[in-house]
Every structure is written in structure tokens, then in C-alpha cells.
């Protein structure tokens, strides 16, 4: 029996793709092997977004290629965004690989493997999976890709060049996948795409995310729905209201604004400016909600006063969750040739300062939850402490809830429990089970 191992890099959209890919391979008689040294195939799902991600992908390819020294039957095959973007360069610079696929649907890749065609990409990427077979994730949450591709053309972003235009799956197809996952015990469905506000623009000729959420909310069973990637420029009142009104949809808004200086936003190609963003957050907070944002430091032309404006804004809005990254100069983007590029050391200093400010804000926000009772999804146990997440916490990027006082009970992973918060940290909470 042929055995395969998967290495997932990059964003959660890759997680969704690889669960489909894994399920398809297993349906063809392949066996998943958790130990890469014992595999016949290693598939590396790469990321090509920014320099740091590209470097990680390349280093990972070399790391796994080295395993071939002790396993002559091993084939190492990179796939995904980096390979779509730099297909010919990778072929030339890493001859040790045994195959290379661009951005293709999992179904296409499996067909190529079955036919012995190990090097293939399309000029127009296949960003959506169209298969009902998928593996069940080891965790109690699952990423479901509702669409992919982007037409925003932000000045700093290369993604449209290798992901293409927005494409959406049908509501019926997504509903069927979510029903299947819930029937298998998945307790949190996380909807992902390059920009979820674009969902339905191509196939329904409108923003169809509210219709999708209304449909998914009617699926039987106890589970959460979390919506990621809401571009602020087209985050409409209808979308906000649909998140607020649907009981199973968490009041968690992932809205990456990138910056707040009107000058920098205009240079980035972002349409909503400072005052409009403030109004947007006010609309979201009409109902108790957690807002997560992502900010960029070091964009060309970012003066000290622009950065200070950003810091002051973070202090004013007090985001429940926040991430940041340093501007990366990427080929085939408008920002690649912009003047006034920022020194790398200054970029790092600004990022550190920004995250230090957010750390204190988060600490203060977490303290306010002491005494409150939250619903928590139990996920694991570490050193006699149960670990779970609340509506505040997307997996891997946000915090956790630690449950230390649970009496003599043995709690079940994947269950929802009520937890009274008794303590807090910078990003995490701790509490005890409500009897």
C-alpha cells in the first residue's frame, strides 16, 4: 500500500484543501503516514504570500528532500501558492524534487498522481475543490472553503496574480459539506476564502454570505460557525446583521484593516478611510462582539507620524484580538516600485512597539471577563488542566481558556461547557466549570 504524508504551510485555506486531498487519496487506497520517514510520498502545501512565508516554504522543501538519502522510494512533491507563482524557478533551482503542482483542485492533483504525471500547473489556477470526499480533521473544528481568489488589487498583495479572480462555491454544496462534518462530530465550522465579503458575487451576482449563514444556521445539532476574512471595504450592514442574528454564528469579526492613516490607506489601494472604519466598528459593536484585525507596519512612505496615528488608533478602538506583519516587497505588486521604502530595522521596531501596546490592551480586556460565564469548546488536557476556546478565540491565532477546577469530573473533548472566568492573562483566560 502506498503511504503519504502531508506538510501544511500557510493559511487555513490550505487546511481545507488538504483535508479534501487527504480524503481523496485515502479513497484511492493510499494510507496516511504520520511519520514522513516512512512515507512513499510527501506533499508540501506551500505559501507564496510574503518573503517570510516563501522562505519557510523553500526551507521546508529542502528539509524533506534530505529524507530521500535514507528512503530511495520517497517522492517529495511541493504544491500550492509558491509553486504556482514560481513554478519554473523551483524546477530549475531544486532538481531534487520528484513532482511539482501549482494551484490545482485536490481532485486534479490526485488524477495526475494516478496517471503518473508529476509536473503540472494551469495558467488559470483551480482554487476551489469540487469533491464531496474529505478527511475528518483530528481536531473538533474544521475549515470550510466557501470561495477563493481576489479582485481587490491591494498595492502590497501578490495573491491575485497566482489565485486569480474570485470564485464561489454554491450554498447547497457548502451546506452539504457542513452537514457531513457536523454529523462526524465537528463542533466548530470556520468559513474561509480570500475575502468572505465577496462570496456569491460571481455565481449569485450579489453578496450572498447572509444567505449562506441563514442556511447553515438551520443545520441540526450543536455547533459553532466562525466567519474569517471580512474585508472592511465591502463589509456591509447586511453581513454584520446576519452574523449577529444567527444563533450558531459567533459574534467574531475578523476585519483586516492594515492601517489607519488615510495617506497610507490610499497608497495601499484601500477604499475605506479612518472615519468610515470607525463607523464600521461602531456598527459591529451594537451587539457584544469580538473584533480581530490585522495591521501592517513599514509600508513605503510610512512616516513616524503615520505610525503614531496607527498606535493611537489601536489604543482608541481596543481590538479584542490583533495580529501584525511587516511589509514585504513583492514582485508584481504596485508597492514593489514605490519610493520611500522603510529600513528593515525600523519595521521590526514598529511591529514590536505595536504588539507591546496591543498586549497591554488585551490584558485589560481579558481582566474584564473575570466573573463572567462563557461557553467553551473543550479541546485537550495538559498537566491536569483542560484547555478550550470561547467565541473570542479562533484556533491557533488567538487565546485559550484554561479550566483548572473541575472537581472529580472527567470532561469530554469536543463538548461545550459553561465556564466561570476566575483569572486572566495577556491573551488567555482561566476558570472553573459551572455545576
From Swiss-Prot:
Record field: transmembrane: none
PROSITE patterns the UniProt entry points to: MTTASE_N (PS51449), MTTASE_RADICAL (PS01278), RADICAL_SAM (PS51918), TRAM (PS50926)
Localization, UniProt: Cytoplasm
Keywords: 4Fe-4S, Cytoplasm, Iron, Iron-sulfur, Metal-binding, S-adenosyl-L-methionine, Transferase
Binding site for [4Fe-4S] cluster 1: 11, 47, 81
Domain MTTase N-terminal: residue ranges: 2-118
Residues noted as binding [4Fe-4S] cluster 2 in the record, renumbered to the chain: 150, 154, 157
Cofactor(s) for this UniProt protein: [4Fe-4S] cluster
GO biological process, one term: tRNA modification
Reactions accelerated catalytically: L-aspartate(89)-[ribosomal protein uS12]-hydrogen + (sulfur carrier)-SH + AH2 + 2 S-adenosyl-L-methionine = 3-methylsulfanyl-L-aspartate(89)-[ribosomal protein uS12]-hydrogen + (sulfur carrier)-H + 5'-deoxyadenosine + L-methionine + A + S-adenosyl-L-homocysteine + 2 H(+)
Coiled-coil ranges from the UniProt annotation: none
All residue ranges annotated as the Radical SAM core domain in the record: 136-364
GO cellular component: cytosol
Annotated TRAM domain residues: 367-435
Signal peptide positions (record): none
SUPFAM superfamilies linked: Radical SAM enzymes
Protein's job: Catalyzes the methylthiolation of an aspartic acid residue of ribosomal protein uS12.
Record family assignment: Belongs to the methylthiotransferase family. RimO subfamily.
HAMAP family according to UniProt: MTTase_RimO (MF_01865)
Protein's name in the database: Ribosomal protein uS12 methylthiotransferase RimO
Native source species: Petrotoga mobilis (strain DSM 10674 / SJ95)
Gene this protein is translated from: rimO
